[in-house]
Curated annotation (Swiss-Prot):
It is a single-pass membrane protein. The keyword Nucleus does not apply. Belongs to the complex I NDUFA3 subunit family. Complex I is composed of 43 different subunits. GO terms for biological process: mitochondrial electron transport, NADH to ubiquinone. Accessory subunit of the mitochondrial membrane respiratory chain NADH dehydrogenase (Complex I), that is believed not to be involved in catalysis. Complex I functions in the transfer of electrons from NADH to the respiratory chain. The immediate electron acceptor for the enzyme is believed to be ubiquinone. Required for the maintenance of muscle integrity and for cell proliferation in the wing imaginal disc epithelium, possibly by interacting with the chaperone-assisted selective autophagy (CASA) pathway. Keywords: Cytoplasm, Electron transport, Membrane, Mitochondrion, Mitochondrion inner membrane, Respiratory chain, Transmembrane, Transmembrane helix, Transport. It comes from Drosophila melanogaster (Fruit fly). Disruption phenotype: RNAi-mediated knockdown in muscle results in defective muscle contraction, sarcomeric defects and loss of muscle integrity. RNAi-mediated knockdown in wing imaginal discs results in reduced wing size. This is NADH dehydrogenase [ubiquinone] 1 alpha subcomplex subunit 3. One of its GO terms (cellular component) is Z disc. Displays weak sequence similarity with mammalian NDUFA3 but is present in the density map in cryo-EM structures in the location of mammalian NDUFA3. It comes from the Eukaryota. The chain crosses the membrane at residues 23-45.
Length: 77
């Protein structure tokens, strides 16, 4: 009789790495890219990245709008 195949998750990953290493490696890189992109987008919006100096259209803010405090002036340079 042959030895029974191991059915744990680590043995499954080892077997996949031995049989199709390009797919496993590519999947790991894709997953890492998705995680880094998610972190990058979260940081972009957390640090008010959409507050660009030059926009394609005009935006008018009222004086009591909290976003009016973040408006950049060209005189800031």
């Amino acid at each position: 009789m042959s030895a029974s195949a191991a059915r744990g998750s680590t043995s499954l990953l080892k077997r996949a790495w031995n049989e199709i290493p390009d797919i496993v490696g590519g999947s790991a890189l894709a997953l890492a890219g998705i995680v880094m992109a998610t972190i990058g987008v979260a940081n972009y919006y957390a640090k008010d990245g959409d507050n660009r100096r030059y926009k394609l259209g005009y935006v008018v803010y009222r004086h009591d709008d909290p976003r009016a405090l973040k408006v950049r002036n060209d005189e800031d340079d």
